[in-house]
């Protein structure tokens, strides 16, 4: 039964070939988000391992991590912390740079977003190289958070991001995998 649910969820993700460039297959979760049953199943599946646990905050990576993270935080009755691109937060922040295919980018968080020792669940829609997620983990740890796990709807295992997080000692949970880039 559980395997069938994940197949149905996987079918709710639109695949767009050659976007944003030739050879890439873009995995678009907006179709999953717009389907109330699929969205509910995805959120429930991500929440289930942590229900009744001691999660203090859910941290979501901009932008689709906000959608998923907000829903997960609501179900877990805990707070939500946005991790944003640099320059988007109004209060005092701490930032972390990370490598892109060509160049670097930077994410930030409010310095007081979590209290030291808070147990945090990191959420985003997809993990590929893991660069953004690793930067988010480092950023959260820098302000005192304890990372309980990192959760993603989609894993692209050939690219290796989930394994990179595991190699850092972070528990990783994903709902589905797609081959390719």
Curated annotation (Swiss-Prot):
Catalytic activity entry: AMP + diphosphate = 5-phospho-alpha-D-ribose 1-diphosphate + adenine
This protein's GO cellular component annotations are:
cytoplasm
Per the record, the pathway is: Purine metabolism; AMP biosynthesis via salvage pathway; AMP from adenine: step 1/1
Q: Could you tell me which HAMAP family the record lists for this protein?
A: Aden_phosphoribosyltr
Q: What does this protein do?
A: Catalyzes a salvage reaction resulting in the formation of AMP, that is energically less costly than de novo synthesis.
Instruction: State the EC number(s).
Output: 2.4.2.7
- Its gene? apt
- Has keyword Magnesium? no
Cite a single Pfam family from the UniProt record: Pribosyltran
**Keyword list, A-Z:** Cytoplasm, Glycosyltransferase, Purine salvage, Transferase
PROSITE patterns, A to Z: PUR_PYR_PR_TRANSFER (PS00103)
- Phylogenetic lineage: Bacteria, Pseudomonadati, Pseudomonadota, Alphaproteobacteria, Hyphomicrobiales
What is stated as this protein's family in its record?
Belongs to the purine/pyrimidine phosphoribosyltransferase family.
Where does the protein end up?
Cytoplasm
Q: What is this protein called?
A: Adenine phosphoribosyltransferase
GO MF entry, a single one: adenine binding
The answer to whether UniProt assigns keyword Transferase to this entry is yes
Entry-linked InterPro entries: Ade_phspho_trans, PRibTrfase_dom, PRTase-like, UPRTase/APRTase
Stretches assigned to coiled coil: none
User: Which GO terms of type biological process are on file?
Assistant: adenine salvage; AMP salvage; purine ribonucleoside salvage
How does this polypeptide assemble, per the annotation?
Homodimer.
- Using the UniProt record, name the top-level EC class of this enzyme in a single word: transferase
Instruction: Give the PANTHER family listed for this entry.
Output: ADENINE PHOSPHORIBOSYLTRANSFERASE (PTHR32315:SF3)
């Amino acid at each position: 039964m559980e395997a069938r649910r994940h197949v149905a969820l996987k079918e709710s993700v639109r695949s767009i070939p050659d976007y944003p460039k030739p050879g890439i297959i873009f995995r678009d979760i907006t179709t999953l988000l717009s389907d109330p049953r699929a969205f509910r199943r995805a959120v429930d599946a991500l929440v289930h391992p942590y229900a009744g646990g001691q999660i203090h905050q859910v941290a979501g990576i901009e932008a689709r991590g906000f959608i998923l993270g907000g829903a997960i935080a609501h179900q877990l009755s805990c707070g939500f912390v946005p991790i944003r691109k640099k320059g988007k937060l109004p209060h005092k922040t701490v930032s972390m740079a990370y490598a892109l295919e060509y160049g670097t980018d930077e994410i930030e968080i409010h310095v007081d977003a979590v209290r030291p020792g808070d147990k945090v669940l990191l959420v985003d829609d997809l993990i590929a190289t893991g660069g953004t997620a690793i930067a988010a983990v480092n950023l959260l740890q820098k302000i005192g958070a304890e990372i309980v796990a990192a959760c993603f709807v989609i894993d692209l295992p050939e690219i290796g991001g989930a394994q990179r997080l595991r190699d850092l000692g972070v528990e990783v949970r994903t709902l589905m995998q797609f081959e390719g880039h």
